[in-house]
Amino acid sequence: MHIKEICLEGFKSYATRTVVPGFDPHFNAITGLNGSGKSNILDSICFVLGITNLQQVRAANLQELVYKQGQAGITRATVSVTFDNSERNRSPLGHEDHSEITVTRQIVVGGKNKYLINGKLAQPNQVQNLFHSVQLNVNNPHFLIMQGRITKVLNMKPMEILSMLEEAAGTRMYENKKEAALKTLEKKQTKVDEINKLLEKDILPALEKLRREKSQYMQWANGNAELDRLKRFCVAFEYVQAEKIRDNSIHVVEEMKIKMTGIDEQTDKTQGEISELEKQIKALTQAREASMGGEVKALSDKVDSLSNEVTRELSKLTNMEDTLQGEEKNAEKMVHNIEDLKKSVEERASALNKCDEGAAELKQKFQEFSTTLEECEREHQGILAGKSSGDEEKCLEDQLRDAKISVGTAETELKQLNTKISHCEKELKEKKSQLMSKQDEAVAVENELDARKNDVESVKRAFDSLPYKEGQMEALEKDRESELEIGHRLKDKVHELSAQLANVQFTYRDPVKNFDRSKVKGVVAKLIKVNDRSSMTALEVTAGGKLFNVIVDTEDTGKQLLQKGDLRRRVTIIPLNKIQSHLVPPRVQQATVGKGNAELALSLVGYSEELKNAMEYVFGSTFVCKTTDAAKEVAFNREIRTPSVTLEGDVFQPSGLLTGGSRKGGGDLLRQLHDLAEAETKFRAHQKSLSEIEANIKELQPLQTKFTDMKAQLELKMYDMSLFLKRAEQNEHHKLGDAVKKLEEEVEEMRSQIKEKEGLYKSCADTVSTLEKSIKDHDKNREGRLKDLEKNIKTLKARIQASSKDLKGHENVRERLVMEQEAVTQEQSYLKSQLTSLRTQISTLASDVGNQRAKVDAIQKDHDQSLSELKLIHAKMKECDTQISGSIAEQEKCLQKISDMKLDRKKLENEVTRMEMEHKNCSVKVDKLVEKHTWITSEKRLFGNGGTDYDFESRDPHKAREELERLQTDQSSLEKRVNKKVTAMFEKAEDEYNALMTKKNIIETDKSKIKKVIEELDEKKKETLKVTWVKVNQDFGSIFSTLLPGTMSKLEPPEGGTFLDGLEVRVAFGDVWKQSLSELSGGQRSLLALSLILALLLFKPAPIYILDEVDAALDLSHTQNIGRMIKSHFPHSQFIVVSLKEGMFSNADVLFRTKFVDGVSTVQRTVTKQS
């Protein structure tokens, strides 16, 4: 493959489209003046080949490859190179079917860089692969020989020359890949070390721990299975017992009902006997009354009559004596009142004298005139109206009529009351006599009633003394159900939150026996309490990873935990006695907190005082700020310069570092911990409440049983007493007692009414007497008094009118004193007349009382004689009552028997009710057990059968219940420690372990393979380098001899080494080998270096070679030798040579001459080869 044509447009100095056609397949030369665009043609070829090192084409960037860098209106550079691809055996891979290949590269100023292969867009790597397949790697261009490269070769060290040989042989790429492979081996070894470290420190300990936890889990799971079997056994026994009670209670209830029926029949029979006895008693009583009733009745009537008469007369005597005593007391009272009034008159007379003495004569006269005038006018008006005085509303005749009517009414009512009371007293006496005859019977009934009341009171006291209230157990059971429901909900919530916070849980095994767990305080996050939820995000950012640190009391405790605590994960431990905190100074705190927008993070969390050092270490050096401005002020203020965090979680460091942005779930950890703490607190409170309720229930169960029994006993006693009371109320003595009590109350009430009416009657009679006297006196003096009064009034008015003005000041006092004195005087006179009348009446009453007392004594004597005769007859009747009493006693026995039978029946009723309730409860219990445990239906047939899980004989149910409770306690305790996810975790850890071991084995295998291949390739490299050395050495000598006849050159190892230690260039002139290259001239040295480069190129010839002024330092003869050498040694490669010397391009087959015309390069082709 060789170049046929190059087309340039806008590339460097080629502004317009310029085609450079007809390249010779062998030797082409390009010549022209400096700056005419010779090297730009070579640069265009490198440009198309995809060069990335732009210094090779003398440009700093792709824009400099455009004509005048796009400033002349040309904004793109395009180069197309057409290759002859007629030799199929040397064609690029994938392009064997194309006879020509055109590769185009175009760049646009500020735009894209694109490649085209045969007019189709291609990627840069496609173009590179195309040229790499024919040994044209433009980024390592051994086919491009520049003048500077020759100079470098002369100064190379042995190893550098060996490196060139390796590149020619193709082993250099192997060395690069070998170095990369060795680095890969190092990385793999590092990976293996990491895997081993991970296995040793994390995976294997975790796997071993999970294996132990899995063993615990299997123990817990097996325990659950045993627990389930025990639960089923206990539930089955409970079911069988409830079913047995339910079925048996029906028969027991039926038997009790039969007994109750028998009791009812016996009661009816006894009731019939009682009826017969009543008839018998009635017959005996009638017979007794027939024989002795007449005489007894006559005497009884006489006694009753005399008794009533004694009572009546005695009542009169008592009333008369009371009246006498009352009148005597009234007389004494009147005497006392008269003395008081006398003193009052004297006092008022003295006061009036003093008033008169202290006033002027005119005042005295005016007072007298005024008083006299008023009295005269009042008296005059009263006389005209028919009154005794002027102060009364009715006239004397009306008052007298009303008083007489009141006297008549009072007298009538007194007579009626006396008649009623006589009748009641007679009846009361009869009833009392009958009541006395039944006294023995009443005492017996009373004693029996007291005994029954005492029984009831005794039972009631015992019942009331029980510390149990009705409904208390039901209320507790209801509370227990409520607490259980709430507890289950809270427990689920705690488990859910605990699962979410598994990474905060700190679990460890006691490092030593009897280890004090109080030394381990816990994880920081669980030891703080945040009251303000809005600051949780800021606090979480402030603490960061320290939230998961574990606080212990001393460093020794931490050391024990790390070494022997069997920790599940890596933890950082904070010993309280060693931790050092950097608390913000108080001065800075005060300066900041005073602003109101910033608070020390430590002040926002609650904690135990013993954790103060650790909390200061975690939260003591950062401020939490409400706003971003406040956070900036705290962080960057010279006086404060303290890290700060906003409520949103943005961090400001005094160094200027800011951290912020979106925080997914900021503060969730502390919020979840807060919720977990609240849930655990509530759960513990409800568990405590539930425990208290359970304890109360357990404590109340015996009391409830005793309460139920006592209640039934009390009901029976009260029912028994109520029956006795009903029977006692039907007793004749009870009826008589009620009648006597009622009569006594009526008599007492009527006596009270008589006393009131007698007082009223006396008062009305006195009023009548007084009024009659007043009317009589009034009629005699009326006319004379009227005339005198009118005359006096006329005179007094005239005098008063004349002196009224002067007397006005003393009138009120004088008038009052005169009126009071007159009133007292009148009252005194009235009382004296009343006292005289009263003493006369007292004398009369005393005589009447003596007569009445003699009458009462005579009647009482007759009554006592008749009563003695009646008692003798009653004694005789008592003998007849013995038989009646016997019948009554028999009747009482029958009644007692009925009462006992009713009591027995009540007991049976209560027992039936209890059994029915027990039957109902057991039925409900059976249904609930079946509903709650669905397996009962399918396994019921096995209950109680030998050889099954429900063999109640071989296994004691009570011990099974105790074992169940113990196992539940053990399982509950184990459940708190067991890791329920351990199976999945163990499988995952085991998979990770197996995966790591697989990776490790693969890496170990790859290492072995790589090492083996490297060893094999090292041997092949030696062989290939040796072959290459021999071939290059031969061509090196041949080419140098051609360029400089009479000389020889070779490559040989340093003294005492092999060719793998490097190669040195040796030169001989004739047969003499030079010791150093410094003996050569500059031209000779250039030819030597060029010979070496061409010898290396000849080892694996490329299809194209480019030489850029490699003959610059040579004279003409040496230049001609280069041309001859190229023709002789590279017959299958195309050479494109840039040279200014004719000796070089004279040997070329085609010569291209460049010129610079009007700022644009042009090319002219000349064929020098003869056909």
Curated annotation (Swiss-Prot):
SMART domains: SMC_hinge. SUPFAM superfamilies: P-loop containing nucleoside triphosphate hydrolases, Smc hinge domain, Tropomyosin. Highly expressed in roots and young floral buds. One of its GO terms (biological process) is cell division. It is found in: Nucleus. GO terms for molecular function: ATP binding; ATP hydrolysis activity. Residues 518-635 form the SMC hinge domain. Residues 172-510, 674-1026 form a coiled coil. GO terms for cellular component: chromosome; nucleus. Residues 2-1158 form the Zinc-hook domain. Keywords: ATP-binding, Cell cycle, Cell division, Coiled coil, DNA condensation, Meiosis, Mitosis, Nucleotide-binding, Nucleus. The SMC hinge domain, which separates the large intramolecular coiled coil regions, allows the heterodimerization with SMC4, forming a V-shaped heterodimer. Forms a heterodimer with SMC4. Component of the condensin complex, which contains the SMC2 and SMC4 heterodimer, and three non SMC subunits that probably regulate the complex: CAPH, CAPD2 and CAPG. Central component of the condensin complex, a complex required for conversion of interphase chromatin into mitotic-like condense chromosomes. The condensin complex probably introduces positive supercoils into relaxed DNA in the presence of type I topoisomerases and converts nicked DNA into positive knotted forms in the presence of type II topoisomerases. Also involved in chromosome segregation in meiosis. Belongs to the SMC family. SMC2 subfamily. This is Structural maintenance of chromosomes protein 2-2. It comes from Arabidopsis thaliana. The gene is SMC2-2.
